Amino acid sequence: MYSNLQKTDKAVFDAVEKELGRQRTKLELIASENFTSLSVMEAQGSILTNKYAEGYPGKRYYGGCEFVDMVETLAIERAKQIFGAEHANVQPHSGAQANMAAYLALINPGDTVLGLNLSHGGHLTHGHPMNFSGKYFKIVPMNVRKEDEQIDYEEAAKLALEHKPKVIMAGASNYSRIFDWKKLREIADSVDAYLICDVAHYAGLIAAGVYSNPVPYADIVTTTTHKTLRGPRGGLILCKEKHAKAVNSSVFPGQQGGPLMHVIAAKAVCFGEALKPEFKEYQTQVVKNAKELSTQLQKLGYRIVSGGTDCHVLCVDLTSKSMTGKAAEEALDKAGITTNKNTIPYDTQKPFITSGVRLGTPAVTTRGMKEAEMAAIASFIDNVLNNADNEAKLAEISKEVTAFLGKFLLYTELN
């Protein structure tokens, strides 16, 4: 796949080869990461990267777009079929740009948005002051309850009545329970607000029917196309037909110029894969693995935020272990286990330190792991965190992890 690159730019080739080695030999537990198929990568690396195609299928500002029109139309129709949506825009370059386009399709700068608090599981684009969302809009944060760390819909309803938001932004980057989209629709309707649902983390699960679908309730649904969807890095917007024109205009020319046709082709491939029966089997296993990993860690004495998980992600509270998320991430990385530090609800630590570490099962499930392997992974994690300051022990565990992964081969076609 990389023979020409090897000949023409050895520096870049070497970096790619080293990253391939890292992906093969490290235990990938970052909840937002996954391993795409070679078909997705081939589409993304195709000659479609050469084509400019400003506009939309049948309405381009450039000639010679008849074949990229075919590709984009395929992606659109497959996305609509997967999620049961009336309209799909496959052009956003990222989830963040999809969110910006969604906001500006419905509201104006200065309007009020009700979104989930970042430290309670939300996302930067749901109102963080350093993000465009926090700079352009007046943000009212939703929270989770202290007692069970699940979304406080009663408080959200009161906040909506008090602040009269124009948009309720529902979604998360670190929330392990199932959103009540119907309840959020009712809250939005009570104050005549729009409902945007960001399902970047849950899209693959939704596509397979193992997580609730917000499309029937939301005005607009946004997502990334990687993570659980296991496609290329990019964004996707789904909406009611009545919002289609505003959404399309907000993406182009509002936020972007020419679409990345090679990425859209890869999205089409990804959506095609999501329509196959084996994709549902995969997503079902992702959830089973996350639940089992949560159970095994709890048996070892770890507290899981909200008491467990209903999806692909879980967050471990390390407070009782007198360890920060930053320290845990660093120790795990030395042992060949890739994770990310994460705040927990009502965290007393700074965002770059944190009291938690976030774990996810999409990537390990892609490698073929099932419940039995989750017990081994929990044991690895426990061994690392109990020996975080022992460099020799961490090196020993790293070798054990590499040997463990030898049974779950990755990208053998690239040898």
From Swiss-Prot:
Reactions the enzyme catalyzes: (6R)-5,10-methylene-5,6,7,8-tetrahydrofolate + glycine + H2O = (6S)-5,6,7,8-tetrahydrofolate + L-serine
Main location group: cytoplasm
EC code(s) of this entry: 2.1.2.1
Cofactors that this protein relies on: pyridoxal 5'-phosphate
Site keyed Plays an important role in substrate specificity: positions: H226
One Pfam family recorded for the sequence: SHMT
Residues with PTM N6-(pyridoxal phosphate)lysine: K227
GO MF term set: glycine hydroxymethyltransferase activity; pyridoxal phosphate binding
Compartments, record wording: Cytoplasm
Pathway: One-carbon metabolism; tetrahydrofolate interconversion; Amino-acid biosynthesis; glycine biosynthesis; glycine from L-serine: step 1/1
Quaternary assembly: Homodimer.
HAMAP family for the chain: SHMT
Protein name: Serine hydroxymethyltransferase
The organism of origin for this protein: Elusimicrobium minutum (strain Pei191)
